[in-house]
Amino acid sequence: FSEKENHRKYDWYVFNSHWCYEKFRYAYGLPTHKCCVIKNALPDIKWKDKPQWQKGNPIKLIHTSTPWRGLNVLLGSMELIKRDDIILDVYTSTKIYGTQFEEQNDKQFKPMYDKMESLKNVNHIGYKTNLEVIDAMQDTQIFAYPSIWEETFCISAMEAMAAGNMAIVTNFGALFETC
Protein backbone atom coordinates (compact mmCIF):
# COMPACT_ATOMS: atom_id res chain seq x y z
CA PHE A 1 0.00 0.00 0.00
CA SER A 2 2.78 2.43 0.78
CA GLU A 3 4.19 2.32 -2.76
CA LYS A 4 2.09 4.79 -4.74
CA GLU A 5 2.64 3.02 -8.09
CA ASN A 6 0.74 0.00 -6.70
CA HIS A 7 -2.47 2.02 -6.35
CA ARG A 8 -3.26 1.65 -10.05
CA LYS A 9 -3.32 -2.15 -9.61
CA TYR A 10 -6.52 -1.88 -7.57
CA ASP A 11 -9.96 -0.74 -8.65
CA TRP A 12 -11.21 -0.13 -5.11
CA TYR A 13 -10.18 -0.15 -1.49
CA VAL A 14 -13.19 -1.22 0.57
CA PHE A 15 -13.36 -0.66 4.32
CA ASN A 16 -15.91 -1.74 6.90
CA SER A 17 -15.78 1.49 8.91
CA HIS A 18 -14.87 5.13 8.42
CA TRP A 19 -12.34 4.76 11.23
CA CYS A 20 -10.52 2.00 9.32
CA TYR A 21 -10.67 3.99 6.08
CA GLU A 22 -9.15 7.06 7.74
CA LYS A 23 -6.35 5.00 9.30
CA PHE A 24 -5.38 3.48 5.93
CA ARG A 25 -5.84 6.75 4.02
CA TYR A 26 -3.56 8.55 6.43
CA ALA A 27 -0.94 5.78 6.73
CA TYR A 28 -0.69 4.91 3.03
CA GLY A 29 -1.91 7.98 1.17
CA LEU A 30 -4.65 6.01 -0.55
CA PRO A 31 -6.41 7.75 -3.44
CA THR A 32 -9.75 8.78 -1.94
CA HIS A 33 -11.61 8.35 -5.25
CA LYS A 34 -10.82 4.61 -5.05
CA CYS A 35 -12.01 4.19 -1.45
CA CYS A 36 -15.45 3.34 -0.11
CA VAL A 37 -16.93 2.20 3.17
CA ILE A 38 -19.42 -0.67 3.23
CA LYS A 39 -20.39 -1.52 6.78
CA ASN A 40 -21.07 -5.02 8.01
CA ALA A 41 -24.60 -6.39 8.00
CA LEU A 42 -26.58 -8.68 10.26
CA PRO A 43 -27.74 -12.19 9.48
CA ASP A 44 -31.31 -12.53 8.27
CA ILE A 45 -32.84 -13.98 11.41
CA LYS A 46 -36.01 -13.47 13.41
CA TRP A 47 -35.19 -11.12 16.27
CA LYS A 48 -37.33 -11.65 19.36
CA ASP A 49 -39.34 -8.88 20.95
CA LYS A 50 -37.53 -8.39 24.22
CA PRO A 51 -39.70 -7.69 27.26
CA GLN A 52 -38.72 -4.62 29.26
CA TRP A 53 -36.54 -5.37 32.26
CA GLN A 54 -38.49 -5.29 35.52
CA LYS A 55 -37.12 -4.13 38.87
CA GLY A 56 -36.28 -7.16 40.98
CA ASN A 57 -35.16 -9.26 38.02
CA PRO A 58 -31.45 -9.95 37.57
CA ILE A 59 -29.50 -7.69 35.23
CA LYS A 60 -27.88 -9.96 32.66
CA LEU A 61 -24.72 -8.95 30.84
CA ILE A 62 -23.10 -10.75 27.94
CA HIS A 63 -19.52 -10.72 26.64
CA THR A 64 -18.82 -12.41 23.30
CA SER A 65 -15.21 -11.94 22.26
CA THR A 66 -11.89 -13.71 22.31
CA PRO A 67 -10.11 -13.79 25.68
CA TRP A 68 -7.38 -11.28 24.78
CA ARG A 69 -9.66 -8.39 23.81
CA GLY A 70 -10.44 -6.93 27.22
CA LEU A 71 -12.02 -9.80 29.13
CA ASN A 72 -9.47 -9.31 31.91
CA VAL A 73 -10.77 -5.76 32.39
CA LEU A 74 -14.37 -6.97 32.53
CA LEU A 75 -13.56 -9.73 35.01
CA GLY A 76 -11.79 -7.20 37.23
CA SER A 77 -14.97 -5.12 37.17
CA MET A 78 -17.17 -8.11 37.96
CA GLU A 79 -14.89 -8.96 40.87
CA LEU A 80 -15.73 -5.57 42.38
CA ILE A 81 -19.48 -5.97 41.92
CA LYS A 82 -20.76 -7.58 45.09
CA ARG A 83 -24.33 -8.19 43.95
CA ASP A 84 -26.12 -11.43 43.17
CA ASP A 85 -28.55 -9.71 40.81
CA ILE A 86 -25.91 -8.75 38.22
CA ILE A 87 -24.85 -11.75 36.14
CA LEU A 88 -22.32 -11.94 33.31
CA ASP A 89 -22.42 -14.70 30.70
CA VAL A 90 -19.07 -15.01 28.90
CA TYR A 91 -18.90 -16.60 25.46
CA THR A 92 -15.16 -16.77 24.90
CA SER A 93 -12.73 -19.30 23.56
CA THR A 94 -9.78 -19.64 21.24
CA LYS A 95 -11.69 -22.46 19.53
CA ILE A 96 -13.28 -19.97 17.12
CA TYR A 97 -9.99 -20.00 15.18
CA GLY A 98 -9.89 -23.80 14.90
CA THR A 99 -8.66 -26.77 16.89
CA GLN A 100 -4.98 -26.25 16.09
CA PHE A 101 -5.09 -22.60 17.20
CA GLU A 102 -6.92 -23.62 20.37
CA GLU A 103 -4.36 -26.33 21.18
CA GLN A 104 -1.48 -23.88 20.71
CA ASN A 105 -2.96 -20.87 22.52
CA ASP A 106 -5.70 -21.76 24.99
CA LYS A 107 -3.38 -22.69 27.90
CA GLN A 108 -2.22 -19.10 28.34
CA PHE A 109 -5.79 -18.07 29.21
CA LYS A 110 -6.31 -20.73 31.89
CA PRO A 111 -5.76 -18.21 34.74
CA MET A 112 -8.53 -16.06 33.24
CA TYR A 113 -10.82 -19.08 32.84
CA ASP A 114 -10.09 -20.06 36.46
CA LYS A 115 -10.94 -16.54 37.59
CA MET A 116 -14.30 -16.78 35.80
CA GLU A 117 -15.02 -20.05 37.58
CA SER A 118 -14.24 -18.43 40.94
CA LEU A 119 -16.67 -15.52 40.46
CA LYS A 120 -20.21 -16.47 41.46
CA ASN A 121 -21.73 -13.76 39.25
CA VAL A 122 -19.88 -14.93 36.09
CA ASN A 123 -20.83 -17.88 33.88
CA HIS A 124 -18.09 -19.09 31.52
CA ILE A 125 -20.09 -20.51 28.61
CA GLY A 126 -17.16 -20.90 26.21
CA TYR A 127 -17.48 -21.41 22.46
CA LYS A 128 -20.89 -21.47 20.78
CA THR A 129 -21.94 -20.92 17.17
CA ASN A 130 -22.82 -17.41 16.07
CA LEU A 131 -26.54 -18.21 15.96
CA GLU A 132 -26.40 -19.65 19.49
CA VAL A 133 -24.67 -16.49 20.72
CA ILE A 134 -27.23 -14.27 18.97
CA ASP A 135 -29.99 -16.30 20.61
CA ALA A 136 -28.35 -15.81 24.02
CA MET A 137 -28.08 -12.05 23.38
CA GLN A 138 -31.83 -11.91 23.15
CA ASP A 139 -32.07 -12.92 26.82
CA THR A 140 -29.64 -10.30 28.17
CA GLN A 141 -29.86 -6.56 28.73
CA ILE A 142 -26.27 -5.34 28.42
CA PHE A 143 -23.45 -6.09 25.97
CA ALA A 144 -20.24 -5.50 27.96
CA TYR A 145 -17.08 -5.09 25.90
CA PRO A 146 -14.25 -3.09 27.50
CA SER A 147 -12.08 -3.70 24.46
CA ILE A 148 -8.34 -3.18 24.53
CA TRP A 149 -8.24 -4.10 20.83
CA GLU A 150 -8.55 -1.64 17.95
CA GLU A 151 -11.58 -3.13 16.23
CA THR A 152 -12.19 -2.09 12.63
CA PHE A 153 -15.89 -2.76 13.29
CA CYS A 154 -17.64 -4.79 15.97
CA ILE A 155 -20.25 -7.11 14.51
CA SER A 156 -20.93 -8.56 17.98
CA ALA A 157 -21.90 -5.13 19.28
CA MET A 158 -24.17 -4.60 16.28
CA GLU A 159 -25.83 -7.99 16.88
CA ALA A 160 -26.24 -7.27 20.59
CA MET A 161 -27.87 -3.90 19.94
CA ALA A 162 -30.18 -5.49 17.36
CA ALA A 163 -31.14 -7.95 20.11
CA GLY A 164 -32.12 -4.99 22.31
CA ASN A 165 -29.02 -4.79 24.52
CA MET A 166 -27.42 -1.59 25.73
CA ALA A 167 -23.79 -1.57 24.65
CA ILE A 168 -21.13 -0.66 27.18
CA VAL A 169 -17.90 -0.43 25.21
CA THR A 170 -14.66 1.49 25.17
CA ASN A 171 -14.09 4.35 22.75
CA PHE A 172 -11.30 2.45 21.01
CA GLY A 173 -10.87 1.73 17.32
CA ALA A 174 -14.17 1.85 15.44
CA LEU A 175 -16.32 0.96 18.47
CA PHE A 176 -17.56 4.55 18.73
CA GLU A 177 -18.79 4.26 15.15
CA THR A 178 -20.42 0.86 15.61
CA CYS A 179 -22.22 1.79 18.82
What does each of the following model-derived ranges do?
Residues 68, 148-155, 176-177:
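Nucleotide-sugar-dependent
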Residues 171-179:
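Short acidic/histidine- and often glycine-rich active-site loop of Leloir-type glycosyltransferases
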Residues 134, 157-162, 176-177:
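Short alpha-helical segment that forms part of, or immediately flanks, the ligand-binding pocket
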Residues 102-131:
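Nucleotide-activated donor-binding/catalytic signature segment of Leloir-type glycosyltransferases, i.e.
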Residues 3, 9-35, 42-45:
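A short, active-site helix/loop in glycosyltransferases that binds the activated sugar's phosphate group
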Residues 138-152, 165:
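Acidic donor-binding loop of glycosyltransferase active sites
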Residues 53-69, 75-79, 89:
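Conserved donor-binding/catalytic core segment of Leloir-type glycosyltransferases
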Residues 151-154, 161, 171:
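Short glycine/acidic-rich beta->alpha loop that forms part of the nucleotide-sugar donor binding site
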